[in-house]
Amino acid sequence: MNAPTPAPSPVDVIPAPVGLLAELTHRCPLRCPYCSNPLELDRRSAELDTQTWLRVLTEAAGLGVLHVHLSGGEPTARPDIVEITAKCAELGLYSNLITSGVGGALAKLDALYDVGLDHVQLSVQGVDAANAEKIGGLKNAQPQKMQFAARVTELGLPLTLNSVIHRGNIHEVPGFIDLAVKLGAKRLEVAHTQYYGWAYVNRAALMPDKSQVDESIRIVEAARERLKGQLVIDLVVPDYYAKYPKACAGGWGRKLMNVTPQGKVLPCHAAETIPGLEFWYVTDHALGEIWTKSPAFAAYRGTSWMKEPCRSCDRREKDWGGCRCQALALTGDAANTDPACSLSPLHAKMRDLAKEEAAETPPDYIYRSIGTNVQNPLSEKAPL
């Protein structure tokens, strides 16, 4: 009698995706210097049409996706945003609108509510209007955001404020907390900048020093106790000052997928920075086929790709080796240990780099823009 075939390791089983990040467009009225979009932004002419997005959502629901994050760019720049949101409701997908709250966002909010929008995440660049508008690169943005937030809570929609923290606004962390309470937000994300995409280009302008980071953490922890039951505060610390890396996107190809405006499906925001990966498009393949068979998703899924010290580490199924894109940017090899990990031989150098940049006078922001040839000031610097 043949021996039974052993069951595959739980690590090797491909789980159903939980979330879909639908980047409907890269168009955005803001020009934030930490934007996680790629440096080469998709133009409007390359964007997926309405029917393709509706098919993608239908396939996502069939795969078991629960949450759809309608993002961009600015998702309300799409004339079909109401139709797309209605499709989420029809399919039973929880819809989260990730928005700047400016431009045409307010004008479309009531219609989005009427078709079943579930949640709004509003980005706020600063508490002081002048500082916020300097960071976002758009004048008169702050009053629009406040009007938008007020209408969200008037409609009874749950509101999350997202504040990306860096040296230009880290002094405003107490103000972000007060603002979230004032606006009636249910949740506040105090998310220290993650240095990918445009943030990597602007790292020297954005990097705070460790004492500032530590103080911001202390403030958040105190506020969590003070506001328990009133406001949930999520805290994301910067990798450059962390002891262990984050599980990027919950683990490469384990929980989330990201569909770009032109239909390229990514395991994470910055995956396109890794050379040699083969990405599939929703115009050529069904979403389920991409999730289970795409070479890009298979490349760093699970643990078999890992080198030491990750391969034998007891945290390998907790943080999944950290961020592949950051490992590439800082070590030159996407399969190396993320240097955010204290077990990486390059961890101390990463800390030193942050310390050096935080001590320097910050350069001017290089603002996010479509159609501009961006010269990355870090491109000529050797990895760690």
Swiss-Prot record:
Its EC number is 1.21.98.4. Keywords: 4Fe-4S, Iron, Iron-sulfur, Metal-binding, Oxidoreductase, PQQ biosynthesis, S-adenosyl-L-methionine. GO terms for molecular function: 4 iron, 4 sulfur cluster binding; cyclase activity; iron ion binding; oxidoreductase activity; S-adenosyl-L-methionine binding. Its cofactor is [4Fe-4S] cluster. Residues 14-230 form the Radical SAM core domain. Pathway: Cofactor biosynthesis; pyrroloquinoline quinone biosynthesis. It catalyses: [PQQ precursor protein] + S-adenosyl-L-methionine = E-Y cross-linked-[PQQ precursor protein] + 5'-deoxyadenosine + L-methionine + H(+). It comes from the Bacteria. CDD domains: Radical_SAM, SPASM_PqqE. Binds 1 [4Fe-4S] cluster. The cluster is coordinated with 3 cysteines and an exchangeable S-adenosyl-L-methionine. One of its GO terms (biological process) is pyrroloquinoline quinone biosynthetic process. Pfam families: Radical_SAM, SPASM. [4Fe-4S] cluster binds at residues 28, 32, 35. The keyword 4Fe-4S applies. Interacts with PqqD. The interaction is necessary for activity of PqqE. Belongs to the radical SAM superfamily. PqqE family. Catalyzes the cross-linking of a glutamate residue and a tyrosine residue in the PqqA protein as part of the biosynthesis of pyrroloquinoline quinone (PQQ). NCBIfam families: PQQ_syn_pqqE, rSAM_more_4Fe4S. HAMAP family: PqqE (MF_00660). This is PqqA peptide cyclase. It comes from Methylorubrum extorquens (strain ATCC 14718 / DSM 1338 / JCM 2805 / NCIMB 9133 / AM1). The gene is pqqE.
